[in-house]
């Protein structure tokens, strides 16, 4: 996983969290001190997974990555099941309308895991390539960070 930071200030850009998980600090312009830059996922067939992620709303770029909401998804060749325990539960993206994404998922035959209607958010969880769960989350008018 990569986090965008406004300045490295001499810090090592790679933080080893153990168990094969690293956070890479990417120095770039950002609206806050820390922001999501990218997520890298293993896939047995990255080309096929890329097509499936595009159907879920991710857009390809010239560098071979997929973009959504200003962050990047990198697909790397490898066995997605080659871990003792999962380190990623799901990828969440903020959307204007969960209902639109649900209708599109149903039309495309995407497997829906569940819909969660919480007091301040509405969320749709679908199964993406290599059984990675994707959450589309919509903030209701009552949503507030304070």
Stretches with model-predicted labels:
Residues 47-48, 99-100, 121:
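Short alpha-helical
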Residues 38, 90, 97:
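Alpha-helical polar/charged "hotspots" used for coordination or helix-helix interfaces
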Residues 92-94, 103:
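A structural feature that tracks compact, well-ordered secondary-structure segments
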Residues 2-38, 61-80, 102-146:
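Vicinal oxygen chelate
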Residues 40-47, 94-95:
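Short, surface-exposed ligand-recognition loops at beta-strand->loop->(often short) alpha-helix junctions
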Residues 44-60, 105:
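Amphipathic alpha-helical segments
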């Amino acid at each position: 996983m990569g986090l965008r930071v406004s300045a490295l200030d001499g810090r090592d850009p790679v933080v080893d969290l153990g168990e094969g998980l690293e956070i890479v600090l990417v120095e770039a312009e950002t609206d806050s001190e820390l922001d999501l830059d990218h997520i890298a996922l293993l896939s047995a067939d990255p080309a096929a997974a890329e097509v499936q992620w595009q159907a879920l709303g991710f857009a390809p770029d010239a560098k071979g990555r997929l973009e959504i909401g200003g962050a990047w998804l990198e697909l790397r060749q490898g066995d997605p099941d080659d871990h003792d325990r999962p380190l990623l539960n799901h990828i969440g993206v903020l959307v204007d309308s969960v209902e639109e994404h649900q209708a599109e998922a149903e039309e495309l035959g995407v497997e829906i895991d569940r819909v969660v209607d919480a007091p301040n958010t509405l969320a749709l969880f679908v199964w993406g390539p290599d059984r990675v769960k994707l959450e589309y989350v919509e903030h209701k008018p009552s949503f507030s960070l304070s």
